[in-house]
Amino acid sequence: MSGGVIRGPAGNNDCRIYVGNLPPDIRTKDVEDVFYKYGAIRDIDLKNRRGGPPFAFVEFEDPRDAEDAVYGRDGYDYDGYRLRVEFPRSGRGGGRGGGGGGGVGAPRGRYGPPSRRSEYRVIVSGLPPSGSWQDLKDHMREAGDVCYADVFRDGTGVVEFVRKEDMTYAVRKLDNTKFRSHEGETAYIRVKVDGPRSPSYGRSRSRSRSRSRSRSNSRSRSYSPRRSRGSPRYSPRHSRSRSRT
C-alpha cells in the first residue's frame, strides 16, 4: 500500500494502533498477517526509513477490534522481535476498564476487566489445551453478538451474549460441535446455559509466548459483533465503505 494513514472523522483514532519494534525486513503483508484475525483492516501505514527501526500504524474498521489487537499483540514475539502495540499517544485517552494504551513494559493487569457484561451466559466445556479466548469468541459468534468471552486452565470457558435469543441459539446449534483452535487442535465441545452465577471461574489459562504466530493471550474480551467467516480479511482504502456483517 502507499500513502499515509487515513484520518477520518473525530474519534476515529480509537480504530488506529501503533506497532513498534518491527524487524528491518518487515513488509506490509507481514503486518497484515499479524493483525487480520482481529477484524477488518482499513489501512496499514508502514514506516521503514533508512537508519531507523520500522514501525507501522494499523487502522481497523471497528474500535473494538483495535482494542482486541492491542491486548492480543502487545509483547508478541514475532521472529525474535517483541512487538510494541499500543494506541497512539495522541489518540484515545484510556482503555476500557481503566488504564491507558500502555507503554513499554506496562503490566497487562492495569487494563482491568471489560466493563460490559451480560446475564445471557453459557458455559463451554471440552476445549482443547491450545484453545484461546479469541478462538472461543470466533466460534460462538456464529450464534450471535458476543459481549464477553474467557477460557480457563481446565478446558472450560464462559461466553456471554448481548441477547437472550443468541444464547438460546448457541445452546441449540453449537452444542456438541467441532471446535478448532488457532493451533489446529480440534475437539467436540459442550455448550450449556449457565445456572446461578458460579462463585468463581478461577484463573484464566496462562500461556507462555512462543515464536509461533498464535493468538495465545487468554485475557477476556468485550463486545464484538458476529462476523461472516467468508468476508475478506483486508479491505483496501478505496473500499472503505464496506459494512460489517
From Swiss-Prot:
Any one GO molecular-function label of the UniProt entry: mRNA binding
What cellular-component terms does GO give this entry? cytoplasm; nuclear speck
What job does this protein perform?
May play a role in preventing exon skipping, ensuring the accuracy of splicing and regulating alternative splicing.
| Location of the RRM domain | 15-90, 120-194
Q: Where is this chain's protein located in or outside the cell?
A: Cytoplasm; Nucleus speckle
Region feature Disordered, mapped onto this chain: 89-116, 192-245
Q: What is the lineage of its organism?
A: Eukaryota, Metazoa, Chordata, Craniata, Vertebrata
Gly residues bias locations: 91-106
Entry-linked InterPro entries: Nucleotide-bd_a/b_plait_sf, RBD_domain_sf, RRM_dom, RRT5_SRSF_SR, SRSF1_RRM1, SRSF1_RRM2
Keywords, sorted A to Z: Cytoplasm, mRNA processing, mRNA splicing, Nucleus, Repeat, RNA-binding
> What protein family does this chain belong to?
Belongs to the splicing factor SR family.
The record ties this protein, via PANTHER family, to: RNA RECOGNITION MOTIF RRM DOMAIN CONTAINING PROTEIN, SERINE_ARGININE-RICH SPLICING FACTOR 1
Keyword Phosphoprotein (UniProt):
no
Composition bias, kind Basic residues: at what positions?
204-245
Tell me what organism the protein belongs to: Danio rerio
Protein name in UniProt: Serine/arginine-rich splicing factor 1B
Report which superkingdom the organism of origin falls in.
Eukaryota
Q: Name one Pfam family in it.
A: RRM_1
* Biological processes annotated in GO: alternative mRNA splicing, via spliceosome
* Principal subcellular localization: cytoplasm
Q: Which gene encodes it?
A: srsf1b
